[in-house]
């Protein structure tokens, strides 16, 4: 179909703001759009008359505005076309974006002069009589003073950085000009909701992320920014920040100014909100107000990113429901958006940005968006995507990546020289810039550094010497994340990931679960009572990574409640809450929700790294009853369940409550089912340097069917502790100090399971000398009384016997 001569080609998006003269010499419309298949969607748009005489006007007599958003040679092109021709066209293709731009165009293009259609929000003026925090008075996330440039350490160019700066990024500062170069890139903002006239602005970066349940587009500039949030379960909403000198106008009705939420705000920019207005629910209105509040509270990066983590934590602690998910998703994404706006704004105001903030910003974007897509809006985590344009020029981003690569290569040669904090900096940088996914052996180097840190922290955890502080938790998260970030088809990547999962399960002991739940409760109180700055990784636990699914079983809750007296913050909170036990139950529920939501779904993790379990299992039984999965070797895994249904070597665990049965199945292709026998034995001592128990797992369970711990024996040092018995310095291996009676099994990598008799025969009770003396004295008194009593009985018997004899003689007479 040829393009009629009366059709006017309006302009390319990048040229629109430059006011170029339109031309009418165009090729065939179909060839221009690159359309070969007939689309299933036909535009049926009625005549739309306009009265504007200006040739550059958006509305002309008997013409229709058309924006091509699909992937084609005409992508990003605006057209004016005669309405009569538009009515006959079938070329319009649904865009790849999930933001429903095509539906918006078709459904709301011909709204005429009616302003109250469902994509325009006439919010009442929003005013608050509260004190707004100063832009430069951000919350400090630690006890250290904020580092500032000095005369001897001024802001510099990226090319002057050295690899050592990667492990100490807090005291290096980058010139703002490194973000944009000599000239700031000017582009046109084309509204994804097709409601606003394109706006020219100085562009810094674009971020697009989402899943099958939602999509978010963020566009960040110096004096302009926008976020568009679209969900499968809710209408889209858009927030725009613009400098006061710029007018935002609607496409329909023609060039009508769009009113900001509050013209009288004290901020240097105006706030615009587009979203459903008519018949909006209370949740919708509440989310709008919260989005606006997040803009007006502060322009400080530290404040906004702390609020982002706080809201993400609250989201994780909130019971799952469509209403809660929609509201919380909007709140968290808006806070993340505002942290990016604040970072750019502060950098251009001060003329510099810290190297640490550049890296933390990229890491936060990845971690927060991926975490959201793990549990929000019933999304499939496998559909998560992130398209993040750096706020650095490409060549400058390459400089940073080159520094990180050099640091990683050097660190992989001598990981012992790195402290926990330095491990955190290196692994966070690798995670933020996707170094694990690069070609060559960089992924292997990152995995090596990560695994060495995990092994070191595992050793401390088993020996009860680990300090679960902020640095350790954050570093451990990035260590696991960097390993799983590596493509699983790379050499040794899957084996390393399976081993990492074993270490995670080994650190996720019963005591650690209880301690973590109490830490989460304390954070919830800090956020809701004190509004303290937090980071979601402050409560990270290996249990989030481990393939252990019994976190929410009731016995963990009981143990946590009994330990509340050791946590004054929780105890004081409960004392001031009139609900009593209900308040304590609520805190426990929130703690369990946080751990459960932050975990990667079981089937996704198994599909990637333990596919033999998925192949040999009934998916419903696996998801419903699996307590633990241990990928103990490169080919086989142990699965602990409450029901039968997994194909492999099946072990029926004896000595547990019949109502809480345990089954252990060793799974390996080709999924042949046989019955296994758990053999009781005394572990023989290995000779010389042999390590027959390396790679085994010590699994301990109680008589009521609860799993206590699964300790991975990863080295000869741990093997020596295991066979030391009562002389072992590790309490998990020492039968004389093992808490709570139970049974210990040793799981071998080849599928063999034995019961360790040492934990059943050596139950020694430690008794104080005072108790022994008291018991001895008491026993002596009891024996004396018994002797006296027996003698009295004997004497009484003799007396009665003699009387009987006398009576007998008397009768004979």
Swiss-Prot record:
The chain crosses the membrane at residues 770-790. It is a single-pass type I membrane protein. Residues 135-159 are annotated as: Disordered. Residues 19-769 are virion surface. Residues 1-18 form the signal peptide. The keyword Transmembrane helix applies. It is found in: Virion membrane; Host cell membrane; Host endosome membrane. The heterodimer glycoprotein H-glycoprotein L is required for the fusion of viral and plasma membranes leading to virus entry into the host cell. Following initial binding to host receptor, membrane fusion is mediated by the fusion machinery composed of gB and the heterodimer gH/gL. May also be involved in the fusion between the virion envelope and the outer nuclear membrane during virion morphogenesis. Interacts with glycoprotein L (gL); this interaction is necessary for the correct processing and cell surface expression of gH. The heterodimer gH/gL seems to interact with gB trimers during fusion. Belongs to the herpesviridae glycoprotein H family. This is Envelope glycoprotein H. It comes from Gallid herpesvirus 2 (strain Chicken/Md5/ATCC VR-987) (GaHV-2). The lineage of its organism: Viruses, Duplodnaviria, Heunggongvirae, Peploviricota, Herviviricetes. The gene is gH.
């Amino acid at each position: 179909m040829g393009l009629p001569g009366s059709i006017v080609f309006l302009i390319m998006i990048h040229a629109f703001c430059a006011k170029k003269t339109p031309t009418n010499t165009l090729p065939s419309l179909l060839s221009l759009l690159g359309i070969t298949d007939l689309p299933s969607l036909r535009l049926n748009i009625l005549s739309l008359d306009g009265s504007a005489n200006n040739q550059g006007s958006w509305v002309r007599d008997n013409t229709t505005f058309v924006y091509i958003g699909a992937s084609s040679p005409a992508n990003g092109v605006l057209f004016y076309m005669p309405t009569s021709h538009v009515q006959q066209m079938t070329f319009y293709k649904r865009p790849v974006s999930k933001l429903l731009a095509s539906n918006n165009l078709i459904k709301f293009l011909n709204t005429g002069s009616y302003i109250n259609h469902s994509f325009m929000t006439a919010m009442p003026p929003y005013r608050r009589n509260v004190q707004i925090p100063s832009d430069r008075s951000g919350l400090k996330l630690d006890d250290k003073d904020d580092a500032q440039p000095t005369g001897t350490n001024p802001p510099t160019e990226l090319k002057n950085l050295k690899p050592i700066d990667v492990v100490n990024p807090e005291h290096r500062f980058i010139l703002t000009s490194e973000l944009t170069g000599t000239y700031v890139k000017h582009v046109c903002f084309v509204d994804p909701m097709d409601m606003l006239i394109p706006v020219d602005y100085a562009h810094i970066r674009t971020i697009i992320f989402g899943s099958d349940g939602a999509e978010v587009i963020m566009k960040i500039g110096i004096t302009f920014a926008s976020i568009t949030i679209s969900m499968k379960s809710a209408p889209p909403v858009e927030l725009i920040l613009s400098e006061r000198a710029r007018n935002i106008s609607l496409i329909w009705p023609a060039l009508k100014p769009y009113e900001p939420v509050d013209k009288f705000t004290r901020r240097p920019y105006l706030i615009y909100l587009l979203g459903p207005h008519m018949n909006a629910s209370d949740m919708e209105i509440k989310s709008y107000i919260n989005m606006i509040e997040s803009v007006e509270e502060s322009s400080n990066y530290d404040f906004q990113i702390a609020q982002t983590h706080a809201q993400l934590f609250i989201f994780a602690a909130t019971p799952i429901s469509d209403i809660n998910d929609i509201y919380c998703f909007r709140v968290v994404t808006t806070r993340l958006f505002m942290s990016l706006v604040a970072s750019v704004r502060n950098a251009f105001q001060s003329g510099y940005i810290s190297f640490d903030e550049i890296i933390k910003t990229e890491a936060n974007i990845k971690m927060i968006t991926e975490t959201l897509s793990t549990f929000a809006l019933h999304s499939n985590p496998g559909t998560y995507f992130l398209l993040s344009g750096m706020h650095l020029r490409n060549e400058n981003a390459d400089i940073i990546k080159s520094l990180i690569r050099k640091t990683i290569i050097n660190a992989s040669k001598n990981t012992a020289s790195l402290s926990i904090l330095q491990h955190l900096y290196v692994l966070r940088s690798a995670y933020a810039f996707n170094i694990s996914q690069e070609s060559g052996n960089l992924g292997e180097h990152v995995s090596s550094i990560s695994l060495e840190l995990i092994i070191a922290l595992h050793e401390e955890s088993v020996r009860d010497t680990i300090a679960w502080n902020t640095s350790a938790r954050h570093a451990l998260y990035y260590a696991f994340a960097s390993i799983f970030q590596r493509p699983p088809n790379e050499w040794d990547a899957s084996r390393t990931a399976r081993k990492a999962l074993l270490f995670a399960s080994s650190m996720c002991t019963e005591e650690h679960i209880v301690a973590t739940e109490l830490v989460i409760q304390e954070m919830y109180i800090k956020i809701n009572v004190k509004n303290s700055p937090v980071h979601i990784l402050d409560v990270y636990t290996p249990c989030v990574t481990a393939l252990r699914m019994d976190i929410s079983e009731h016995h963990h809750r009981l143990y946590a409640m009994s330990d509340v007296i050791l946590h004054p913050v929780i105890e004081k909170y409960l004392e001031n809450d009139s609900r009593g036990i209900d308040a304590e139950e609520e805190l426990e529920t929130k703690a369990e929700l946080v751990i459960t939501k932050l975990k990667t779904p079981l089937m996704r993790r198994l599909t990637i790294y333990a596919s033999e379990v998925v192949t040999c299992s009934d998916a419903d039984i696996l998801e419903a009853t699996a307590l633990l999965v241990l990928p103990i070797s490169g080919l086989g895994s142990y699965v602990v369940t409450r029901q039968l249904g997994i194909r492999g070597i099946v072990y029926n665990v004896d000595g547990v409550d019949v109502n809480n049965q345990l089954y252990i199945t060793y799974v390996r292709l080709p999924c042949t089912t046989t019955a296994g026998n758990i053999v009781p034995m005394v572990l023989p001592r290995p000779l010389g340097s042999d390590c027959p128990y390396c790679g085994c797992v010590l699994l301990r369970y109680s008589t009521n069917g609860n799993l206590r711990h699964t300790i991975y024996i990863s080295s000869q040092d741990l093997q020596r502790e295991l066979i030391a018995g009562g002389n072992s310095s590790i309490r998990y291996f020492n039968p004389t100090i093992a808490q709570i009676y139970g049974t210990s099994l040793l799981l071998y990598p080849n599928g063999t399971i034995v019961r360790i008799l040492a934990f059943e025969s050596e139950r020694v009770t430690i008794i104080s000398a005072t108790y022994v003396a008291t018991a001895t004295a008491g026993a002596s008194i009891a024996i004396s009384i018994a002797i006296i009593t027996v003698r009295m009985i004997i004497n009484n018997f003799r007396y009665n016997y003699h009387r009987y004899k006398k009576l007998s003689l008397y009768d004979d007479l």
